[in-house]
């Protein structure tokens, strides 16, 4: 099978459409001067990791997470295919503590993946941040679970987001990620996966161990679309008086 790998914005196709016009830029600038972007302004962290499709491990994507804390036990992240200004918004991830994960229904748990080996293996890092500072937070991340959906299949060269959202998973052991993708990221960001792995050896995952239903429960997962009867408007209670 041919590998479908997307390493960064530099390896993706150009998005079709006209170049942003000067008039549009002026309007955007004027609006940004008076509007609040409070949710986006809460983003405090850039994490780089690698995701694979939950139904096809040969399809792998470099994923740049721009995250904010909802509270001490939950983060929410916008995912881009690169760190540059022209990066494509390809997905999102919710990250929760082990405590919150354990409150989820069993069927829901299958959609979430563990972060222990992603962190301890050195595959998740903060571009530009010294290792010692990274490790203070990543020690916490190693104990969490994440739920990821990607909406844009950049690894297939799609110029626009086409098709259904895809459930994504994270690395759980060695040998799952293509070596050339890791090497390319190491070169671009000046990091060492092996070096970080050694430095993170003291870290531990969830206190109760990785839940057996996490990571798809060991099975592949894929969303499917089916037609259903739509609820007619007459059956919806009136909201106006």
Curated annotation (Swiss-Prot):
PANTHER family the UniProt entry points to: OIL BODY-ASSOCIATED PROTEIN 1B, PTHR31360
Pfam families: DUF1264
Family under the similarity heading: Belongs to the OBAP family.
Leader peptide range in chain numbering: none
Lineage: Eukaryota, Viridiplantae, Streptophyta, Embryophyta, Tracheophyta
Polar residues bias (residue ranges): 1-12
Organism superkingdom: Eukaryota
Source species of the chain: Arabidopsis thaliana (Mouse-ear cress)
Protein known as: Oil body-associated protein 1B
Disordered, as annotated region: 1-22
Gene encoding the protein: OBAP1B
């Amino acid at each position: 099978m041919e590998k479908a790998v997307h390493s960064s914005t530099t390896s993706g196709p150009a998005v079709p459409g006209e170049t942003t016009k000067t008039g549009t830029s002026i309007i955007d600038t004027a609006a940004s001067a008076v509007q609040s972007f409070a949710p986006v302004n809460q983003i405090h962290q850039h994490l780089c990791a690698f995701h694979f499709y939950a139904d096809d491990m040969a399809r792998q994507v470099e994923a740049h997470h721009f995250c904010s804390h909802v509270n001490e036990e939950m983060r929410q992240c916008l995912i881009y295919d690169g760190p540059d200004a022209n990066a494509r918004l390809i997905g999102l991830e919710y990250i929760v503590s082990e405590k919150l994960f354990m409150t989820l229904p069993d069927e829901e748990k299958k959609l979430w993946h563990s972060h222990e080996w992603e962190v301890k293996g050195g595959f998740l890092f903060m571009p530009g941040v010294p290792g010692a500072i990274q490790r203070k937070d990543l020690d916490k991340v190693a104990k969490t679970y994440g739920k990821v959906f990607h909406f844009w299949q950049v690894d297939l060269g799609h110029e626009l987001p086409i098709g259904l959202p895809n459930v994504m998973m994270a690395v759980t052991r060695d040998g799952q990620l293509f070596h050339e993708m890791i090497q390319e990221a190491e070169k671009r960001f000046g990091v060492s996966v092996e070096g970080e792995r050694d430095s993170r050896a003291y870290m531990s995952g969830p206190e109760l161990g990785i839940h057996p239903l996490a990571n798809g429960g060991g099975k592949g997962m894929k969303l499917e679309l089916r037609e259903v009867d739509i609820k007619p408007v007459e059956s919806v209670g009136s909201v106006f008086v």
